[in-house]
Amino acid sequence: MLTSSIFLPSDCTAQALADFEKLVIEGGAVNPQGLAQRIRKASRLLFVWASDDQLVGVGALKHPRAGYRNKVFADARATVPADEYLVELGWVVVTKSHQGRRLSTRIVGELLPFAKNENIFATTRADERVMSFATDYGFKLNGKAYPSGHGYDLVLYLRNAARFPDAM
């Protein structure tokens, strides 16, 4: 049985924050430089544990800096302005031992109510089915794939809160 909890970063122990960071780094899609600080600035952190208290999944809602948002939207050649999407869904990582169980879908579904009235963006590798569940939650691909700088391309997904006023 899996259990999940959502916390403000300020309510997490140092060990919980370190475990979150470790799993995100193991996921391999994030620059680890400054990650601990970015985790502490997130608006919500979600943790999923297996029955043996092993951390098997994480996710977050973030309010990234305008410079980062603007770069993502420009790189993706987004068709809408970055300042309309202030919340980022990210750091959705599931351990290899628990992949294929739709745990990412659960993580996203549990986080979205904390940003139900907000437009949300997310990025993921273009070559993965990471956001295959995106349409379940109203995310739509926007713009074009762009280089990540780490040897793979990224794509931008957007969720417009106005389209789903009663979804949460």
Report the location of each language-model feature.
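Conserved acyl-donor/pantetheine-binding loop and adjacent beta-alpha core of acyl/acetyltransferases
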Residues: 54-91, 148-152
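Short amphipathic alpha-helix that is part of the acyltransferase structural core
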Residues: 1-37, 45-56
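Short secondary-structure capping micro-motifs at structural edges
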Residues: 33-36, 75-78, 106
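Conserved active-site alpha-helix within GNAT-family acetyltransferase domains
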Residues: 126-151
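C-terminal "cap" of GNAT-fold acetyltransferases
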Residues: 127, 147-168
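Short hydrophobic/aromatic beta-strand element in the GNAT-like acyltransferase core
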Residues: 43-48, 58, 91, 154-156
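Conserved GNAT acetyl-CoA-binding A-motif
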Residues: 113-126
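Conserved acetyl-CoA-binding loop-helix of GNAT-fold acetyltransferases
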Residues: 90-94, 99-113, 136
